[in-house]
Amino acid sequence: AGSAFQSLGRIGFVLRNRGYLVLLVIFSLMVMPVMSFLSTSSFIYMNLFNLSAEKYSYFFAFNGCFAMLAPILYMRVLRKLPRLLFLTVCFGCVAVSGSLILIFGAANPFVFALLYVPVTFFGSACRPAGTMLIMNQMDTDNGTVGSLWGCVALLFGSLSMMLCSLNWPVLTMAVGTISLCAGTSCVIIWLVAVSRKMFK
């Protein structure tokens, strides 16, 4: 029992770090657009666009290629950009892509796939920088820091999937709305946090 209470105490200690808490919220929000796509993509491609399972798998693989490409490009090229500019662009592009999906996403499968690419690419590209920022906020309790981020990100992702289960007129609207709201929220919180120097 003592060990459990001590663990909870360490979680409370970590969450009292304002910089960590702000970054935790920002980068957990970025999980939501990805999880909204994962939970709805089969319904969008197969039910809305009437594609076969095989054709759906091609579109899904196309999207997955950008998820793999983004971290590679970050390590080789994108990390040389100023962090403030890079992350602001990432969050902003997710928001813009979300708004375009909201308006044009239901047109056809190719339009939806292309409009979702920035969400996948920039959502994945910002993750290495986010991991570094989050881990740098604490000199101790690295296990708690990493575990808490994984847990909160999972909760945000679950919330996204739950929101997608609501009665949307078209499921592309769910993906677009969540991407727009998450990206916009990240831009606002990020710029406020930077201006107030909330983190290291």
Which residues are covered by each model-predicted region?
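Juxtamembrane intracellular "pre-TM" segments in multi-pass secondary transporters
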Residues: 1-24
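A late C-terminal transmembrane helix in Major Facilitator Superfamily
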Residues: 121, 133-170, 178-179
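Helix-to-loop junctions at the C-terminal end of transmembrane segments
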Residues: 70-83
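Short amphipathic helix-loop junctions that connect adjacent transmembrane helices
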Residues: 39-54
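C-terminal transmembrane helical hairpin of 12-TM major facilitator-type secondary transporters
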Residues: 84-130
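Small-residue hotspots at the loop-to-helix junctions and early N-terminal turns
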Residues: 53-61, 146-147
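Pair of pore-lining "gating" transmembrane helices in MFS-fold secondary transporters
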Residues: 16-36, 117-118
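Multi-pass alpha-helical transporter architecture, strongest
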Residues: 177-200
